[in-house]
C-alpha cells in the first residue's frame, strides 16, 4: 500500500482526480502486456537435452547390449513409426543390459530428431511407466540417468506430453533423485523438473506441492559443476514464474537467500536466471517487494544494470522496475543504490525494449514524492525522456509520457516549470493525435497540470495571463484539444471541453464551440470523424 503522505498528497492537493495513486504508480497493467509479458528469446521455459556428437560416439562404443545406432535401419520397425519392435521387446525384458540399451535408443530418438517422436513414444503402451520404473533402480545409476533423460525430453514437449510424465508418477521420484549420490542423475532430475514446472502454473504448483524446494536448494550448498548450477537456477526461476495465479509466496520465498548469492556468480546464464527469478518474486504487492528488499539484493541488481550482456540487463531491469512499484520507502531503497545514473545510461540503449523498460521504471519513480522527483531532475534524466518522447518508437514514448505526466502531477511549481523550460509541452501536445486513448488522457493530464500551475502564477503576479496557454497554442495543442471534443471516448472529450472552457475560453467566444447535448441520452452529440491509424495530422 502507498504511504499515507503520498495518498493524501495525490488526492487532496490536486483537482485532477483522474490520475489517482494506483494509476500513477502502475503495476504491470493489462494494456502493457507487450512490454510487461513480452516473449523473451533470452529465456526458455523448456529445454530439450540433445547429445553432442562426441557424447554419441562414446555411448556407441560403450553400448552394453551390442546394438549400435547404425543397426537401427536394419531392424524391423513398429507399424507406422520409428520405434522398432526390438526396442519395445528390450525395454520390457528382464535383462538390465537390454533395458539400458533400449532406453539409450529411445533417448537418442528423442534427442536427435528436429521433431522428436514424442507422441509415438508416449502412445506406445507401457513405455512411459517403464521409464518411470527405471528411475527407481538405485543399483543402476546409468539406467536411472538414461531414463531420466528420456522423460526430460518428453516433458520438453507440449502440455499434453508433459502431463503424461506427471500422470506416470515421475515428479516425486525426480525430487527424490535430487538427493542421488550421482551428480549426472541429480542434474538430469533437475532438468526434468524444470521442464515440468515450466509448462504451466498448474504443473508449477504441483511440483511445489511435492516439496521440491528443500532438496533443490540443498543442491546449491555443494560445490557443483557449472551445468548443474545453471540447470538448478533455471528450474528455480520456473518455480517462481507465472502470474495467473502466481505461486504461493510462502512456498517460493525460501529461495531468496540462495538467489541473493547467485547474483555474484560470474556465469551469464546463472545471473540471468537468478535475475528472472527475482523479477517474478518482486512482481506483486508490497509485502512481496519488501521480502525481496530484505534479501539484500537491491544494490547488486542495480550494479547488474550495467552488465555487458543484455541477457542479464533485461531481467535485472525488470526486477528493479518491479521494486519501484512499491511505496516511497521501497522506491527510496533503489534510489539509495545510485540507480538513476544506470537508468540514464539505459535510456540511450540501442535495444528498444531496454529503453522502454527503463522509461517505465523511471515513471514509477516520478510517481513518488517531490524529493524523489528532484533526484530524477538532479540526475539530468528529463532531457533524455523528452528526447525519447519526440523520437522513439511509440511504445517507448508512452512510457516516457507517463514519467513526465507523473512528475507534473506530484511535482512542485519549480519542478513543473523546469519541465516546461526543457520543452515538454510540444511532445505532450503531439501525443494528443495518437489512437491510444489512454496515452491521450495521460498527455491531457500533463497539460492540465501545467495549465493549473500557470493559472496560479497569473493570479499571483496579477497579470491574469496564463503563460502556458500561449506555449500550448504555439505547439498546435489548442487545435488538437479542440478536435478532441469530438473524440469517441467520453472522458477524453469531457476533459478536452473542460480545458477549453476553463483555460482558453473567452466571454465573447462563439458558443458553437460547445458540443450539443442530447437531453434524452444525457450525453454530448458530436460529428463522427474517421481517424487514420497513425493519428490525426494537424
UniProtKB/Swiss-Prot annotation:
PTM note: Polyubiquitinated in the presence of RAG1 (in vitro).
Modified residues (Phosphoserine): 63
Keywords: Acetylation, Cytoplasm, Host-virus interaction, Nucleus, Phosphoprotein, Protein transport, Repeat, Transport, Ubl conjugation
GO cellular component: cytoplasm; cytosol; dendrite; glutamatergic synapse; NLS-dependent protein nuclear import complex; nuclear pore; nucleoplasm; nucleus
Residues with PTM N-acetylmethionine: 1
Role, per record: Functions in nuclear protein import as an adapter protein for nuclear receptor KPNB1. Binds specifically and directly to substrates containing either a simple or bipartite NLS motif. Docking of the importin/substrate complex to the nuclear pore complex (NPC) is mediated by KPNB1 through binding to nucleoporin FxFG repeats and the complex is subsequently translocated through the pore by an energy requiring, Ran-dependent mechanism.
Free-text comment on this protein's domains from its UniProt entry: Consists of an N-terminal hydrophilic region, a hydrophobic central region composed of 10 repeats, and a short hydrophilic C-terminus. The N-terminal hydrophilic region contains the importin beta binding domain (IBB domain), which is sufficient for binding importin beta and essential for nuclear protein import. The IBB domain is thought to act as an intrasteric autoregulatory sequence by interacting with the internal autoinhibitory NLS. Binding of KPNB1 probably overlaps the internal NLS and contributes to a high affinity for cytoplasmic NLS-containing cargo substrates. After dissociation of the importin/substrate complex in the nucleus the internal autohibitory NLS contributes to a low affinity for nuclear NLS-containing proteins.
Family label: Belongs to the importin alpha family.
Name of the featured protein: Importin subunit alpha-5
UniProt source species: Homo sapiens
Amino acid at each position: 500500500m502507498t504511504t499515507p503522505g503520498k495518498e493524501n498528497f495525490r488526492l487532496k492537493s490536486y483537482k485532477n482526480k483522474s490520475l489517482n495513486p494506483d494509476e500513477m504508480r502502475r503495476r504491470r497493467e493489462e494494456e502493457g502486456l507487450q512490454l510487461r509479458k513480452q516473449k523473451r528469446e533470452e529465456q526458455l521455459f523448456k529445454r530439450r537435452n540433445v547429445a553432442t556428437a562426441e557424447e554419441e560416439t562414446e555411448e556407441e562404443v560403450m553400448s552394453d547390449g551390442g546394438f549400435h545406432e547404425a543397426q537401427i535401419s536394419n531392424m524391423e520397425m513398429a507399424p507406422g513409426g520409428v520405434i522398432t519392435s526390438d526396442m519395445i521387446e528390450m525395454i520390457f525384458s528382464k535383462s538390465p543390459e537390454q533395458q539400458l540399451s533400449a532406453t539409450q535408443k529411445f533417448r537418442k530418438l528423442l534427442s536427435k530428431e528436429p521433431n522428436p517422436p514424442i507422441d509415438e513414444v508416449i502412445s506406445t503402451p507401457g513405455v512411459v511407466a517403464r521409464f518411470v520404473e527405471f528411475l527407481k533402480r538405485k543399483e543402476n545409476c546409468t539406467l536411472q540417468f538414461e531414463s531420466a533423460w528420456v522423460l526430460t525430453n518428453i516433458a520438453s514437449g507440449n502440455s499434453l506430453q508433459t502431463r503424461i510424465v506427471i500422470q506416470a508418477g515421475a515428479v516425486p521420484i525426480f525430487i527424490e533423485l535430487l538427493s542421488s549420490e550421482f551428480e549426472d542423475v541429480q542434474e538430469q532430475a533437475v532438468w526434468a523438473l524444470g521442464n515440468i514446472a515450466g509448462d504451466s502454473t498448474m504443473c508449477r504448483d504441483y511440483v511445489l506441492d511435492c516439496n521440491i524446494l528443500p532438496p533443490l536448494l540443498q543442491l546449491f550448498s555443494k560445490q557443483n559443476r557449472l551445468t548443474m548450477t545453471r540447470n538448478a537456477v533455471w528450474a528455480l526461476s520456473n518455480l517462481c514464474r507465472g502470474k495467473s495465479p502466481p505461486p504461493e509466496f510462502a512456498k517460493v520465498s525460501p529461495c531468496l537467500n540462495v538467489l541473493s548469492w547467485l547474483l555474484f556468480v560470474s556465469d551469464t546464464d546463472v545471473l540471468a536466471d537468478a535475475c528472472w527469478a527475482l523479477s517474478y518474486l518482486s512482481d506483486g504487492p508490497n509485502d512481496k517487494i519488501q521480502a525481496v528488499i530484505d534479501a539484500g539484493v537491491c544494490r547488486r541488481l542495480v550494479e547488474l544494470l550495467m552488465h555487458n550482456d543484455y541477457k542479464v540487463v533485461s531481467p535485472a531491469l525488470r526486477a528493479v522496475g518491479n521494486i519501484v512499484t512499491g511505496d516511497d520507502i521501497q522506491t527510496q531503497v533503489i534510489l539509495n543504490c545510485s540507480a538513476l545514473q544506470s537508468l540514464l545510461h539505459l535510456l540511450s540503449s540501442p535495444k528498444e525494449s531496454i529503453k522502454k523498460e527503463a522509461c517505465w521504471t523511471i515513471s514509477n519513480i516520478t510517481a513518488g514524492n517531490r524529493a524523489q522527483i528532484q533526484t530524477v531532475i538532479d540526475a539530468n534524466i528529463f532531457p533524455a525522456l523528452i528526447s525519447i518522447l519526440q523520437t522513439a518508437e511509440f511504445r517507448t514514448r508512452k512510457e516516457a509520457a507517463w514519467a513526465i505526466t507523473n512528475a507534473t502531477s506530484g511535482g512542485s511549481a519549480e519542478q513543473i516549470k523546469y519541465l516546461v523550460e526543457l520543452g515538454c509541452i510540444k511532445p505532450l501536445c503531439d501525443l494528443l493525435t495518437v489512437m491510444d486513448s489512454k496515452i491521450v488522457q495521460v498527455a491531457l493530464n500533463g497539460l492540465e497540470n501545467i495549465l493549473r500551475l500557470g493559472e496560479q502564477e497569473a493570479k499571483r503576479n496579477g497579470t491574469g495571463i496564463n503563460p502556458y496557454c500561449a506555449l500550448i497554442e504555439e505547439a498546435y495543442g489548442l487545435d488538437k484539444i479542440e478536435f478532441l471534443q469530438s473524440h469517441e471516448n467520453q472522458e477524453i472529450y469531457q476533459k478536452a471541453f473542460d480545458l477549453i472552457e476553463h483555460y482558453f475560453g473567452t466571454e465573447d467566444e462563439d458558443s458553437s464551440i460547445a458540443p450539443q447535448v442530447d437531453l434524452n441520452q444525457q450525453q454530448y452529440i458530436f460529428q463522427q470523424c474517421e481517424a487514420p491509424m497513425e493519428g490525426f495530422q494537424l
